[in-house]
Amino acid sequence: MATLFIADLHLQTEEPAIVAGFLRFLAVEARQADALYILGDLFEAWIGDDDPNPLHREIAAAIKAVVNVGVPCFFIHGNRDFLIGKRFARESGMILLPQEKVLDLYGRNVLIMHGDTLCTDDAGYQAFRAKVHNPWVQRLFLTLPLFIRRRIAARMRAGSKAANSSKSLDIMDVNAQTVVAEMEKHRVQWLIHGHTHRPAVHELSANDQPAFRVVLGAWHHEGSMVKVTPDNVELIAFPL
């Protein structure tokens, strides 16, 4: 019995080794799990479910194959793929979840999320996030021709990279008070998230009790997953 969590794969055709590693993960580890949760940034960018990129179809088919053998797959949007919609969910068999979700995992209540909403010290990013998550802005963007959407997405990624290069690492990490507030709001002692690309298990106090924040790593030269069993919560790095 095990439930698996992954995040921040940033899949793109320019990184075939990561794509191949994820396909192997789906073919082996994922099929042995009780469930698979993908906590955002599965793709490096997403400009709409109507994008004919062959990689998207390949990944959808591979996830659907896992679902078809009886392993449910769930998805929380990240900051790179927040426009993944019902069409891709249907093609992949994934169940779309809200940005925060509490799970009962073998007797533990665990809060899961992508993690960008915890980085409240980065006021510039939070303001940008509020704009692009406006439903009207998203609807307008999705009405644009694909070639224009690609240009806008490329420009936004370049702008984000430039902005992040001038920010301190502390600003781009989670805010400790925000973490505690979220865990106490949901009355949990466990939090699993991604986004920061800083894999670790942090001990803290929430609800006047010991608590744990487990941060998934990004997939680069190795993969990263959290494996939750009735007896343990493990952060695992593995070769791709």
UniProtKB/Swiss-Prot annotation:
It is found in: Cell inner membrane. GO terms for molecular function: manganese ion binding; UDP-2,3-diacylglucosamine hydrolase activity. One of its GO terms (cellular component) is extrinsic component of plasma membrane. Binds 2 Mn(2+) ions per subunit in a binuclear metal center. Its main location: membrane. Transmembrane segments: none annotated. GO terms for biological process: lipid A biosynthetic process. It catalyses: UDP-2-N,3-O-bis[(3R)-3-hydroxytetradecanoyl]-alpha-D-glucosamine + H2O = 2-N,3-O-bis[(3R)-3-hydroxytetradecanoyl]-alpha-D-glucosaminyl 1-phosphate + UMP + 2 H(+). It is a peripheral membrane protein. It is an enzyme of class 3 (hydrolase). Its cofactor is Mn(2+). Keywords: Cell inner membrane, Cell membrane, Hydrolase, Lipid A biosynthesis, Lipid biosynthesis, Lipid metabolism, Manganese, Membrane, Metal-binding. Substrate binds at N79, R80, D122, S160, N164, K167, H195. Its EC number is 3.6.1.54. Belongs to the LpxH family. Hydrolyzes the pyrophosphate bond of UDP-2,3-diacylglucosamine to yield 2,3-diacylglucosamine 1-phosphate (lipid X) and UMP by catalyzing the attack of water at the alpha-P atom. Involved in the biosynthesis of lipid A, a phosphorylated glycolipid that anchors the lipopolysaccharide to the outer membrane of the cell. This is UDP-2,3-diacylglucosamine hydrolase. It comes from Salmonella dublin (strain CT_02021853). The gene is lpxH.
